[in-house]
């Protein structure tokens, strides 16, 4: 809704009410011409644009307490005046996480389809969650599917209480690249950042794609949980507990001794192990990894959910060193007792190259997850908070490089 100035000349009406009044007073021929012009501009860029206009018309009526009524093109034009386009990835597309695609049909032998989640930044440094799909065949190319030029607006079911989940229905998306999860709540008004997605095996044997992200609100940050079973219907649920007001939490992909497990960094310096019987409530924890090498002296955190291997839980880490240079390393945790660190990398696996030092935030390489297939690892990572690149490495070689 357009805001009101305290210096407005007209008193007794809001600016929004004055806009509606002007549209209601338009002669039919002017109305028809303006609406036709608007459709000619927008229909090639958006799908079901008239449906969006009608929804915005209903939103405007609700916000203005039903003080007006219109139908047909006039109602849609009112909706258009309370709409705007937003280039959600115009500034950056980075900090990816990655999971196996639930549909592996049609994949070449030995290949793997995957889903990337990405942090997209648009005008005003506002972050949202975007998705891409692709195919990876170890030893060969990584092929990203062509992204749709369109983005679809989800249908939103708001909760009755602040503690309940928000439901997002993205059935209008014809391709996953059209699905954009935008900040929609007051506690997310500064953006939603760095989704760490994993494939979580539930107690009943089913799979839930779930991950934490950082909600940036007017009063600070907090961790929230995104969950879906089909990448069409999503739930956004706030996390509770003493460490919910932090960044960089990452779920283990299965329960450990009957409890959910999470890595966190609620002291802004070390990696902690957290266990909980409630997926949405997290307290306490044990500090398990602390800064040791020069490239991680400032702080240490995870780069996504742990990956289970025969040798232990593989955790990619990020370390911050001099000049706030972000590098990527790794450590290995015991499978049955993940509070025990078996080994870790003395030197970074990835650090910003000369070509990667310049961007929105210089001197940064960062990831929110990796994918293991056999002995091969696919590690997508963000560069300088600007774009996304990919690296591949051997699990055996990585473990051999640890101390």
Go through each PLM region and give its residues.
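Extended, compositionally biased non-globular segments
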Residues: 315, 365-369
